[in-house]
Amino acid sequence: MLLLHWDNMGKIELHHVFVMLSCIYLIFSDISINSAVVFLFSSIFFYISFTAGKRLYYLIGIDKENLKINLKKHYNFGIFLMIVGLIAVTSDLIWVKDVPLFNPLSRKFLNVYFTTLSHLFLVGWAIVVASSNIDKKKILLYTIIFSILIMLLGYRTNVLVLLISVGAILYYKNKISNREILKYGILVFVILLGLSILRLYALGVEGNPITSRISLTMSIYDIIFNNFNGVFNGYIHYSAVFSYLGLCNGARTVIAKTLGIYNVSITPTIVGAVIGDYGTLAIIPYFGILGIFLGFFYKLAKDVKGIYLGIYGILFAYTLIGIESGILDIDVILYYFFGLILCIYAILLRKLKR
């Protein structure tokens, strides 16, 4: 009966899942009341902004017929990105001369540029799925196979991005129902749990693979909120970009060193990164702009499909993962900018057609 009721519900959207996951993080954490209230407010404000973005799409009145979507070109572009990503994955494994999945300590020897380029495989496959009519069962089979390939690099995030983005794309193409997306979500959680247990086993560490990570991440956020509120003055997000040019440490490493922790990187949560850089009030413009953009892009992607839906699927995944890790990688930031460019292109094309 519960599954039947689930199928009769409307579409589950990003802002729904964002608030739900944020609440889960709060439930499994032990942080100060003030920081908890701000964290919850951030997710609720994102929810409201996302809804406003959807409304804005209707107010502007995008005509998808004017966009002249060529799904074949989008498909070919996706295949090209997959090839580049596959070459990068192979090169990275050759570079490190080990398999980080089974030896997590070897992950620090991966080539940062190969690793970054390997993410194009995820983007390419998302675009291919969004631009083609491949059978649903084949897509899921290929996705599992590709997940095994990607997880060799030892990053759970990449596997999650692949699984979540494909699930979102199939769901918004109406190829899977509410009931099926629930089952798919459970499968993704089981895979995450398995990878987390494998990582702890390889490191010889004991503990709950899920709640211990949530508790640690939220405690870091709590420390930033109470002791480093606005202290970084934009340096965290500066590091997210310029660390790839060798000008500074990565954003998460900067946070770790500030807290006196060395040889590891630390995830500050998406809220913690913003507050650490710009102060508590910065969550209003940050989540306001992010929510409006993603709400608008969601409606555009759902109507147009192709590369629009492919990129939205990737942003869907990174936004949810960003609750813990923050949006602090240059390639991920570029995906958001690419999505923004697609939105601007659709708006300008409408204006020019008038």
Swiss-Prot record:
Transmembrane is among the record's keywords: yes
Bilayer disposition of the protein: Multi-pass membrane protein
Primary residence: membrane
One family name in Pfam for this protein: O_anti_polymase
CC per GO annotation: plasma membrane
Membrane-crossing segments per the record: 9-29, 31-51, 76-96, 109-129, 144-164, 185-205, 278-298, 306-326, 327-347
Keyword vocabulary terms for this entry: Cell membrane, Membrane, Transmembrane, Transmembrane helix
Locations listed in the record: Cell membrane
Domain of life: Archaea
The name this protein goes by in its record: Uncharacterized protein MJ0419
Organism: Methanocaldococcus jannaschii (strain ATCC 43067 / DSM 2661 / JAL-1 / JCM 10045 / NBRC 100440) (Methanococcus jannaschii)
